[in-house]
């Protein structure tokens, strides 16, 4: 590193890049004119949720299974791609092709210790590509494909987008997507890229605890309040301390751990039972993906039950070698297994309190967010830390983040109305940003918890005589040496006129907009020459070409999904019609007593042949099912019409019944 900046006449090194932190002034009327309805998506490690601001309030939207949260799981079978419940339900029988916890990979490097640890715990294959973790999976017809974490996240975002579109009855292009407050620059940008691949304009990235604070404070009037948001989800943990004052949400401090959550608690339960099975049965199931899939499902179920019960029995049929598994698990044992992890959550709470400069008695409300905050021991630790203060039960921990994101969406689209017009978000950069100076020192430029949007300038000069280029290394982190911080990349400033060291004055300006997007401009004060600086691609971002390719592939998958659904619908239509016919000709209240014997025989023959054909043609195409339906209708409909005409009723029994019963079968 050969650059120095200067205050007065002294040389100092400089530079910086700003973290894609998130949210901003909400009165964005100029944005509202360009945006349609903006949905809010909580893209979670284990579950995702979508909401929309509509008719003066937030609607959290249920998926096609009727659930308001959707598992962040994707699975591939020989015939189709599954997302959500359908994928998770297949995990035990299709482990190597079922992908989950991808949020723990997004924006990370392959050699990150968290990635290396997770590789040993998941049944699917994680491989290195361009220094990033990719997921290798067999899709169909034996074809093996690698997906970036962004692509898998995009599939989940697409599911949430389609859920909203089904509810609203229109195409959605714009979304607010949430990220953990402690996500770094690369993780934020990767999340935004996932939105692009899903066909979404990510109008804003906002921090999860800030979104939850909006959900809590939207209808809170009156004086200033300090709130602490404790957000412990499936895979990540955040603590944010905010001041709320009549619609102004100002983040004072944030802290967290992007690799701590419910999945880790499940893993401890699994490890306990794996050891128990080895001890009792002499069987090691740690490499048996099917057994682990079943155990993972039951570990999560047991953990949830222990939030309201003191003991559960974990029972799994034929877990290994045809052996059934049945063991008790007490809440006390569960707490003992996870004691260190539960206590680990208190560290960020203390740091955030110190950074905010608040005493415990100055926190007015504690807001719990994320499913893992239902764990009694976690609540007890928090209560003890705050000298007996009870946490607020005012928000739904599963839905609060999507709720706040939907409010922000309503503001950006202009659909929020009077209820949201006074809301102002002042969020912060969670990590210190700085540059490397001589000796590998981390020179801080933007301290953590700086309110964004922000704009900072600094004057550079040269370190050597006749130097025409300055190389600037940018880092994020809290340590004093850059080797202990995360390298965000570097940029070169070229074309400096040759001069003695310390002579040139180059002003570099770092500006972060409301989306947390960084613009860097450099100007030679001597010549007036200015140029934009682009951070190099060191931080593992997808290139524009890669994103465009992934968008195309996502569209191809969507087209395939559509064809699969059309095929299923066509098969269901045929089955429904055939069974309706069978029921009608055997039901005395319908057609049984009105048919001539030869008419009944014709219908019975046609329906029997159709059912046999269905059994023999499981993988037929949509057109085949449509054609078969026409054949059966050609036999049955004229008979039904004749019967109704004979009895003086309106024709159409079969057809109208089909219309009545044409709902998708579960």
Curated annotation (Swiss-Prot):
A Pfam match: HSP70
Disulphide linkage map: none
Biased composition regions of type Acidic residues, renumbered to the chain: 656-666
Family matches, as Gene3D superfamilies: 1.20.1270.10, 3.30.420.40, Actin, Chain A, domain 4, Substrate Binding Domain Of DNAk, Chain A, domain 1
GO CC, alphabetical: cytoplasm; endoplasmic reticulum chaperone complex; endoplasmic reticulum lumen; membrane; nucleus
Chain positions of motif Prevents secretion from ER: 663-666
Entry keyword Ion transport: no
InterPro entries associated with the record: ATPase_NBD, BIP_NBD, Heat_shock_70_CS, HSP70_C_sf, HSP70_peptide-bd_sf, Hsp_70_fam
Protein name per UniProt: Luminal-binding protein
NCBIfam families membership: PRK00290.1
Subcellular localization: Endoplasmic reticulum lumen
Disordered: annotated span: 644-666
Function: Probably plays a role in facilitating the assembly of multimeric protein complexes inside the ER.
An example molecular function term from Gene Ontology annotations: ATP hydrolysis activity
Signal peptide: 1-28
Keywords: ATP-binding, Endoplasmic reticulum, Glycoprotein, Nucleotide-binding, Signal
């Amino acid at each position: 590193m050969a650059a120095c900046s200067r205050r007065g006449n002294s040389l100092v090194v400089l530079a910086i890049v700003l973290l894609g932190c998130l949210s901003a002034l909400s009165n964005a009327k100029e944005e509202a004119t360009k945006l349609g309805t903006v949905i809010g998506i909580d893209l979670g490690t284990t579950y995702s949720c979508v909401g929309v601001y509509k008719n003066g309030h937030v609607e959290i939207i249920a998926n096609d299974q009727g659930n308001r949260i959707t598992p962040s799981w994707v699975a591939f079978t020989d015939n189709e791609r599954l997302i959500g419940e359908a994928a998770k339900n297949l995990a035990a029988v299709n482990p190597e092709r079922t992908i989950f916890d991808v949020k723990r990979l997004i924006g990370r490097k392959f050699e990150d210790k968290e990635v290396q640890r997770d590789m040993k715990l998941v049944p699917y294959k994680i491989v290195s590509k361009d220094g990033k973790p990719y997921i290798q999976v067999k899709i169909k017809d034996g074809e093996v494909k690698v997906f970036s974490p962004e692509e898998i996240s995009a599939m989940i975002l697409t599911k949430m987008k389609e859920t909203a579109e089904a509810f609203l009855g229109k195409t959605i292009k714009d979304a607010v997507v949430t990220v953990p407050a402690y996500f770094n620059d690369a993780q934020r940008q990767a999340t935004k890229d996932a939105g692009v691949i899903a066909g979404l304009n990510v109008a804003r990235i906002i921090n999860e605890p800030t979104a939850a604070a909006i959900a809590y404070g939207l209808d809170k009037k009156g004086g200033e309040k300090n709130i602490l948001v404790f957000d412990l989800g499936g895979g990540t943990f955040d603590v944010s301390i905010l001041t709320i004052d009549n619609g102004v949400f100002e983040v004072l401090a944030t802290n967290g751990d992007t690799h701590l959550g419910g999945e880790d608690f499940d893993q401890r339960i699994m490890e306990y039972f794996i050891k128990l099975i080895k001890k009792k049965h002499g069987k090691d199931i740690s490499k048996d993906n099917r057994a682990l899939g079943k155990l993972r499902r039951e570990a999560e179920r047991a953990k949830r039950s222990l939030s309201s019960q003191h003991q559960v029995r974990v029972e799994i049929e034929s877990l290994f070698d045809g052996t059934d598994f049945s063991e008790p698990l007490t809440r006390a044992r569960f707490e003992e297994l996870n004691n260190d992890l539960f206590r680990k959550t208190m560290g960020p709470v203390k740091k955030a309190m110190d950074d905010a400069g608040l005493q415990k008695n100055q926190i007015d409300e504690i807001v719990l967010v994320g499913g893992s905050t239902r764990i009694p021991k976690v609540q007890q630790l928090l209560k003890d830390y705050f000298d007996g203060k009870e946490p607020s039960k005012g928000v739904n921990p599963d839905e609060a983040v999507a709720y706040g994101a939907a409010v922000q969406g309503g503001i950006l689209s202009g659909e929020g109305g009077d209820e949201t017009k006074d809301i102002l978000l002042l969020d912060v950069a969670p990590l210190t940003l700085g540059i490397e100076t001589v000796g590998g020192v981390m020179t801080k430029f933007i301290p953590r918890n700086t309110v964004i949007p922000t704009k900072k300038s600094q004057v550079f000069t040269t370190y050597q005589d006749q130097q025409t280029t300055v190389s600037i290394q940018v880092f994020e982190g809290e340590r004093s040496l850059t080797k202990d911080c995360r390298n965000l990349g570097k940029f070169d400033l070229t074309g400096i006129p040759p001069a003695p060291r310390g002579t040139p004055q180059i002003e570099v300006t770092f500006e972060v907009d409301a989306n947390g997007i960084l613009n860097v401009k450099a100007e030679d004060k001597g010549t007036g020459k200015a140029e934009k600086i682009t951070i190099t691609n060191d931080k593992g971002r997808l290139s524009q070409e890669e994103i465009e390719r992934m968008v195309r592939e996502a569209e191809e998958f969507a087209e395939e999904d559509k064809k699969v659904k059309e095929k299923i619908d066509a098969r269901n239509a045929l089955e429904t019609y055939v069974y309706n016919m069978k029921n009608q000709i055997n039901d005395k209240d319908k057609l049984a007593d009105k048919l001539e014997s030869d008419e009944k025989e014709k219908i019975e023959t046609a329906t029997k042949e159709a059912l046999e054909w269905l059994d023999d043609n499981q993988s037929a195409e949509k057109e085949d099912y449509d054609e078969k339906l026409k054949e059966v209708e050609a036999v049955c409909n004229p008979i039904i019409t004749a019967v109704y005409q004979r009895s003086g009723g309106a024709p159409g029994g079969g057809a109208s019944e089909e219309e009545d019963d044409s709902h998708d079968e579960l």
